[in-house]
């Protein structure tokens, strides 16, 4: 099967619709849509749910950009892309709940293809999902990783362990020497064994996100919380901001190549705080988080 960008685009548009409808049904609030065009080619649909019953902010973004040539920053490490037109498309989302006992979640699936006459296209898929709890619950982490493992199973026994490790390695905040959360799946440059298999895997990851996340939301949404939990949640959200602005390749690439800033920064939490030399009280649930987010085999 030859790479079919149009087929991928239709799936991504449906995936954005499905995820937004599912999150709206859980929350009770609706997304607002902001459609945009990119002068250099392409555009997208940014959707945001704000101040909902459960989600303080949820952003679900679809983008499809194209051009006659790749920027020099992208071809420096990939000389085979020089002189090719390209298309890049994907769905990216981040959900920031209000209740500190519900973790923040992030998911992304994407496709890239570069073509020139008389040559085979260069293409690959990427994506994944990861979870960032503020208070650790083992059953939530096990469910998240079991869902990830089960969706990987049809594609090979080594797929889950490989992409789990990649996720743990990627979502590491080097300047803090700590994980961003408990990980999940992360893959990139996927183009073997063939287009159909890779596309099927990307679809499984995209659809698997809500199956992994929503049972956790349902389990935690009625838990009572107060000022202490909220203060800790806002402090830990600072780590999310630090990772995205300092280390995340997608954020940096988007900002450095003239991407749409509002859509790129849609992943930012609406409220966040920093505190100099914060130390949680010994033996407290807040202190337990640093141990909980250590890399381990959850399933």
Swiss-Prot record:
Q: Which GO terms describe its biological process?
A: protoporphyrinogen IX biosynthetic process
Q: Which Gene3D superfamilies match?
A: Coproporphyrinogen III oxidase, aerobic (3.40.1500.10)
- Chief place of localization: cytoplasm
Q: For binding a divalent metal cation, which residues are annotated in this chain's numbering?
A: 96, 106, 145, 175
Binding of substrate, residues: 92, 108-110, 258-260
Indicate where this protein resides in the cell: Cytoplasm
Region feature (Important for dimerization):
240-275
- Give GO cellular component annotations, separated by semicolons: cytoplasm
- E.C. no: 1.3.3.3
Per the record, the pathway is: Porphyrin-containing compound metabolism; protoporphyrin-IX biosynthesis; protoporphyrinogen-IX from coproporphyrinogen-III (O2 route): step 1/1
Q: Which InterPro entries match?
A: Coprogen_oxidase_aer, Coprogen_oxidase_aer_sf, Coprogen_oxidase_CS
Q: Which family does it belong to?
A: Belongs to the aerobic coproporphyrinogen-III oxidase family.
| Assembly mode | Homodimer.
Question: What is the designated name of this protein?
Answer: Oxygen-dependent coproporphyrinogen-III oxidase
- Which species does this protein come from? Salmonella arizonae (strain ATCC BAA-731 / CDC346-86 / RSK2980)
Q: What taxonomic ancestry is recorded?
A: Bacteria, Pseudomonadati, Pseudomonadota, Gammaproteobacteria, Enterobacterales
């Amino acid at each position: 099967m030859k790479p079919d960008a149009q087929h991928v685009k239709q799936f991504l548009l449906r995936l954005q619709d499905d995820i937004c409808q599912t999150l709206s049904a859980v929350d009770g609030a609706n997304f607002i849509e902001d459609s945009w065009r990119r002068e250099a080619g392409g555009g997208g649909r940014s959707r945001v749910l704000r101040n909902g019953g459960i989600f303080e902010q949820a952003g679900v973004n679809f983008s499809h950009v194209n051009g006659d040539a790749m920027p020099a920053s992208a071809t420096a490490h990939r000389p085979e892309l020089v002189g090719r037109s390209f298309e890049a498309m994907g769905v990216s989302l981040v959900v920031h709940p209000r209740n500190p006992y519900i973790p923040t979640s992030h998911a992304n699936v994407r496709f890239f293809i570069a073509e020139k006459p008389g040559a085979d296209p260069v293409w690959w898929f990427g994506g994944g999902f990861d979870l960032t709890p503020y208070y650790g619950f083992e059953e939530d982490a096990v469910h998240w990783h079991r869902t990830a493992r089960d969706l990987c199973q049809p594609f090979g026994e080594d797929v889950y362990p490989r992409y789990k490790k990649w996720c743990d390695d990627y979502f590491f905040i080097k300047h803090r020497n700590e994980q961003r959360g408990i990980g999940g799946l992360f893959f990139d440059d996927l183009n073997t064994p063939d287009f159909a298999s890779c596309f099927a895997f990307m679809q499984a990851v995209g659809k698997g996100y809500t199956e992994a996340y929503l049972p956790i939301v349902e389990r935690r949404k009625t838990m009572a919380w107060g000022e202490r939990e909220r203060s800790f949640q806002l402090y830990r959200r600072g780590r999310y901001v630090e990772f995205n602005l300092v280390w995340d390749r997608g954020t940096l690439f988007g900002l450095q190549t003239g991407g749409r800033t509002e859509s790129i920064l849609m992943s930012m939490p609406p409220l966040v705080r920093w505190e100099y030399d914060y130390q949680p009280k010994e033996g407290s649930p807040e202190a337990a988080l640093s141990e909980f987010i250590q890399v381990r085999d959850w399933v």
